[in-house]
């Protein structure tokens, strides 16, 4: 019996809603990255984008454990000497919680064209409302 290899045209995609309120950022992000990649499906093929669409709500209520709010830094560099800018995650989560969540998921996905394609299926919202009711998303309960 031959192994099944998924083709891009045959992949059926579902829509899921994940509530991130009160849950650790890394744990939610790792499960969302797995769904975006399609690893929860028996037809997973590494070289095909076979993941589902994910809507994350309540991104502003996500939690960082321990002292990470003050000690973990978001780093960006201007490529000039001395151009490293560091921002504590406390400020990032106050100003742009959607960006913090998307960045955590992006770093868990493959780099390259396929990873960027997977990331486009992620929709993150600060509050509890989203505008994807027409897609009839299923509520997804996370494992932990």
From Swiss-Prot:
One GO MF term attached to the UniProt entry: mRNA binding
Any Pfam family matching the protein: Ribosomal_L13
GO cellular component term, pick one: cytosolic large ribosomal subunit
Organism domain of life: Bacteria
Keywords: Ribonucleoprotein, Ribosomal protein
GO BP annotation list: negative regulation of translation; translation
Subunit note: Part of the 50S ribosomal subunit.
Family: Belongs to the universal ribosomal protein uL13 family.
PANTHER family: LARGE RIBOSOMAL SUBUNIT PROTEIN UL13M (PTHR11545:SF2), RIBOSOMAL PROTEIN L13 (PTHR11545)
Free-text function comment from the UniProt entry: This protein is one of the early assembly proteins of the 50S ribosomal subunit, although it is not seen to bind rRNA by itself. It is important during the early stages of 50S assembly.
Protein name per its UniProtKB record: Large ribosomal subunit protein uL13
Species in which this protein is naturally found: Clostridium perfringens (strain 13 / Type A)
Higher taxonomy: Bacteria, Bacillati, Bacillota, Clostridia, Eubacteriales
């Amino acid at each position: 019996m031959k192994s099944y290899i998924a083709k891009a045209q045959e992949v059926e995609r579902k829509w899921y809603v994940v509530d991130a309120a009160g849950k650790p950022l890394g744990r939610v992000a790792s499960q969302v990255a797995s769904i975006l990649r399609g690893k929860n499906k028996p037809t997973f093929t590494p070289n095909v984008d076979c993941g589902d669409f994910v809507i994350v709500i309540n991104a502003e209520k996500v939690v960082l454990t321990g002292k990470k709010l003050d000690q973990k830094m978001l780093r960006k560099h201007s490529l000039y000497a001395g151009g490293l800018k560091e921002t504590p995650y406390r400020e990032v989560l106050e100003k742009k919680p959607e960006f913090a969540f998307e960045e955590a998921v992006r770093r868990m996905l493959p780099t390259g064209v396929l990873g960027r394609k997977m990331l486009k299926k992620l929709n993150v919202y600060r509050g509890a409302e989203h505008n994807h009711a027409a897609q009839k998303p299923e509520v997804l309960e996370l494992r932990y």
